[in-house]
């Protein structure tokens, strides 16, 4: 896939409870992906790791805006991928699980630092 813009992909999918983003890892030319999964009000968890392959990404604001039922977010890539300001503000302050050896890196990374209190080592994850 040669997509460069996936703004509003899966936006307002109000019946979506889970999603596998693995196929998006092959979309290596994406530069903009604002509002991805935004307003998916029944989504309970998401693994954002596949987005790490988007090395050209410059904007991904409001990724999870309005996802009020999220129990957790996981991101198992190192280093942290580019994150726009406010991208993970979802209203419920759920934990963001990252690799154990990368917790400090995530907590100090640009725009990730805004979520430092929510960033936890994946080894502490108890939710399914």
Identify the meaning behind each predicted range:
Residues 1-128:
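Solvent-exposed loop and capping/linker segments of extracellular ligand-binding repeat ectodomains
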